């Protein structure tokens, strides 16, 4: 992580060979030191190594405190004003004022005309953090953007793989003359995680290793209209599909493999439809339906469709 937010587009000194983003590399490196120590502590706990667990948990907490003291004001404002820094802040709950952080992040996106500027560190977090923090419409807007920089910009230029750089091909279709220019690079392909977890809505659950139980929790978007995904897990094939016939009705189909279960969290179910949905999926508990193995198809009317366009107030 000492390379920072590699290939981000927000460095004020831009040039054909610029590779470093504007997010402080020491902020990223120190933060991931804390995160890594926490992962080691968690693994040690699972394996029963209590002494090591306590050692690395203490290290993680101390390092998080160092990051917060160095890079955050007393009111919780992050002193690094980049998309990646604020995404990390929300992901790892570094600020005591997350509403302020969300407003800061939305302001940055307004200033960039709702275009991403993230690199190898920020992009894997980008859409997941936006959706998890009530900015799902912005996440979809970033996915569906056809201009540079964006995923569909690459598709429009004929890409069948994800590039290392957002501009590996120029707008006229010629290969950029920039050095270090891979045409098949995973980093920005990390958008697939968000597409599985939030668009289609298939989520593995840490409490159920081997995907013996998954969660179906799709998010709907009128600009996309439908989505479908399959997950060939160690326990069997899960699948889900949703399709909007109009802005008031959706049909969702779900398949749960033999000897497995799924937890379904359906979006925007109108109150008048809950009884009909329960006839297909069974009783609801805390907004969740427990599905046994089998095929399910449910159609229902949506609650009032409200575009959740956030208002930026500084």
Identify the role of each PLM range.
Residues 58, 137-314:
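Non-catalytic C-terminal accessory modules of carbohydrate-active enzymes
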């Amino acid at each position: 992580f000492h390379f920072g937010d590699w290939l981000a587009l927000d460095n004020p000194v831009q040039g054909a060979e610029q590779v470093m983003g504007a997010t402080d590399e020491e902020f990223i490196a120190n933060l991931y030191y804390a995160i890594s120590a926490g992962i080691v502590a968690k693994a040690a706990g699972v394996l029963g190594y209590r002494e090591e667990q306590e050692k690395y948990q203490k290290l993680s907490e101390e390092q998080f405190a160092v990051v917060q003291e160095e890079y955050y004001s007393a009111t919780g404002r992050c002193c690094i004003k980049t998309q990646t820094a604020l995404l990390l802040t929300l992901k790892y709950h570094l600020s005591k004022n997350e509403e302020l952080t969300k407003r800061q992040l939305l302001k940055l996106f307004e200033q960039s005309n709702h275009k991403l500027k993230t690199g190898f560190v920020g992009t894997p977090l980008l859409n997941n953090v936006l959706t998890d923090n009530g900015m799902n419409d912005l996440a979809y807007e970033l996915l569906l953007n056809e201009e540079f920089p964006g995923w569909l910009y690459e598709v429009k230029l004929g890409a069948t793989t994800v590039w290392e750089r957002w501009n590996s091909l120029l707008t006229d279709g010629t290969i950029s003359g920039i050095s270090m220019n891979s045409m098949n690079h995973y980093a920005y392909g990390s958008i697939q995680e968000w597409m599985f977890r939030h668009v289609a809505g298939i989520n593995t659950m840490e409490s159920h290793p081997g995907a013996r139980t998954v969660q179906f929790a799709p998010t709907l978007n009128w600009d996309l209209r439908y989505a479908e995904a399959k997950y060939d897990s160690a326990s069997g094939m899960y699948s889900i599909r949703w399709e909007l016939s109009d802005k008031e009705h959706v049909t969702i189909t779900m398949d749960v493999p033999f000897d497995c279960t799924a937890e379904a969290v359906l979006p925007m179910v109108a109150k008048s439809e809950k009884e009909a949905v329960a006839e297909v999926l069974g009783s609801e508990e805390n907004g969740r339906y427990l599905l046994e193995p089998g095929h399910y198809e449910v159609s229902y009317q949506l609650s009032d469709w409200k575009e959740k366009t956030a208002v930026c107030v500084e």
